Amino acid sequence: MNSSSRIPAAGPLSYRQAGVDIEAADHFARSLRALAARTHGPDVVPTGDAYGALFRPPLAGLDSPLLAATCDGVGTKLLVARACGDYRGLGQDLVAMNVNDLLPRGARPLFFLDYIAVGRLADLEARDGRPGALSDVAQGMVAACAQVGCALIGGETAEMPDLYRPGDFDLAGFAVGLVDAARVPAGDVAAGDVVLGLAANGVHANGFSLIRRVLSDAGIEYGQPLPGMQSPIGAMLLQPTALYVAPVLALMSQVRVKAAAHATGGGILGRARGVVPDGLRVELDRSAFARP
């Protein structure tokens, strides 16, 4: 058998036959661009539909400007959202996990980009009068970016039915911020320094692999309330991650913050180890804050 006999005689294949709906992807991209335009100020340079967003950083008054960059996702909180059928908080989660990571450098968020990977876009479209999952995510991203003064300037939506199961999708985000070198916390922590903490409004978007395992082992469903609580555990877990940009930057403008940590993976103790020098320890007064 020669090689030519193995070539199929059928006509050319299309993207749609391969499981990728280019028209649906273009429609979603256009709708997201229209939403994202609400977050654009004069620093965003119009480029139409061209790839490669342009941004004019506000450098006035900065002696030694530095850019800070972060990349993060929302982890397996996606699985809780899917189980509960509630995706409304995930967009804010995605933005918050990134812009909050800029704060330990004292950086103000400038712009944000998203990456959305899906099995099939059709599985995530609006149904029965309810917005689709990705529409909820997009609305949340735009609202969160607007709240912190961060422009949503681009992103990517990839439809990969061979990689993701029907109804599955994943989220990642990228944020860039700006800070004057003189305002970056120097890390010169010393004995006697005061530790300040900002209260969380929930578990944010970390630790969900452990949380899901604990609930599964205990036989607790997401629709059940925990003892002494009225809200279902699912609703509590899906509380959107708090945006700390305004209070943290306001504090940093008034006092010199020596070090800061975003208490995500590893929690308070794990993150504190990264900013406290060897030979020192952090002492926390548990009576000073309410434990959940």
Question: Where would I find each of the regions flagged by the language model?
Answer:
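Glycine-/charge-enriched secondary-structure boundary and capping motifs
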Residues: 2-17, 34, 63, 123-151, ...
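Acidic/polar, glycine-rich intrinsically disordered N-terminal extensions of enzymes
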Residues: 15-40, 44
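Predominant activation on well-ordered alpha-helical scaffold segments within soluble catalytic domains
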Residues: 26-33, 51-55, 65, 96, ...
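Glycine-rich phosphate/pyrophosphate-binding loop regions near the starts of catalytic domains
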Residues: 34-201
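Short, acidic (Asp/Glu-rich) active-site segment that either coordinates a divalent metal cofactor
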Residues: 71, 183-233, 269
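Short loop/turn motifs at secondary-structure junctions
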Residues: 106-108, 210, 256
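Short gly/pro/ser/thr-enriched loop/turn and capping motifs at secondary-structure boundaries
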Residues: 160, 181-182, 204-205, 267-269, ...
